[in-house]
Amino acid sequence: MYSTRFRRGLSYVPRRYNPRNYGFKRTFVVKRGDAKRRQTQVKKLTEDVKMSSQRIHENQYGPEFVMAHNTAISTFINYPQLCKTQPNRSRSYIKLKSLHFKGTLKIERVGSEVNMAGLNPKIEGVFTVVLVVDRKPHLNPTGNLLQFDELFGARIHSLGNLAVTPALKERFYILHVLKRVISVEKDSMMLDLEGSTCLSSRRYNCWSTFKDLDPSSCNGVYDNISKNAILVYYCWMSDAMSKASTFVSFDLDYFG
């Protein structure tokens, strides 16, 4: 007769230790994937921490925010990290409440351009700041953010009413547009930039989620955001040889 020791539910003999069986089980657990265990570890680190209303501050300035005439640049708003030091987040998601920005724009003449009367012509142009929500964030095939022309059709469209191209309307929507029409005879001038917009209201909540694949990547950069990233586009359109430089501070109010 066969022993009932290996038949489920029929044996009352205590199971003896078998090194081969236990070693096999350990190998099986590892093969199920380290990613799930890392995500579980990330979740356990913060599951006991309460969510709270906070604000994260960011300054955008420097050489990468200097534009020649008839050019545009694209960037994004950094979100909080999953950590213990505020401003932070305690989950793999946050509620976006509102976004405020304030800063300065400097327009400068480049080179010596003289008109028929022997005078420097006016610097005339339009500077635009556009805030855009990216519902399904991912980099383009070249590893970069979507450029101004790709999203809005052409930079010259900033002179009128901007609209997302039809093919991208399901993924992107315009959150806020700020325009400054400039006409100056001097070689340089400075202007104030200021604006604010609400992302959540009593009728609608805007949530952003994060990939957080492992503890080392639980940051707030665009590549780790899986839903509702905020992109910022700056565009300077002018026929005059000139450049535009910005220093803009952003304050994001959120619950997380």
From Swiss-Prot:
It is a peripheral membrane protein. Signal peptide: none annotated. It is found in: Host nucleus; Host cytoplasm; Host cell membrane. GO terms for biological process: DNA transport; transport of virus in host, cell to cell. One of its GO terms (molecular function) is single-stranded DNA binding. Residues 150-187 are annotated as: Interaction with Arabidopsis thaliana NSI protein. Keywords: DNA-binding, Host cell membrane, Host cytoplasm, Host membrane, Host nucleus, Host-virus interaction, Membrane, Transport, Viral movement protein. GO terms for cellular component: host cell; host cell cytoplasm; host cell nucleus; host cell plasma membrane; membrane; viral capsid. A motif (Bipartite nuclear localization signal) lies at residues 21-42. A motif (Nuclear localization signal) lies at residues 81-96. Pfam families: Gemini_coat (PF00844). Belongs to the begomovirus nuclear shuttle protein family. Binds to the genomic viral ssDNA, shuttles it into and out of the cell nucleus. Begomoviruses use 2 proteins to transport their DNA from cell to cell. The nuclear shuttle protein (NSP) shuttles it between nucleus and cytoplasm and the movement protein (MP) probably transports the DNA-NSP complex to the cell periphery and facilitates movement across the cell wall. Binds to single-stranded and double-stranded viral DNA. Interacts with the host nuclear shuttle interacting (NSI) protein. This interaction may allow NSP to recruit NSI monomers to the viral genome and thus regulate nuclear export of viral genome by NSP. This is Nuclear shuttle protein.
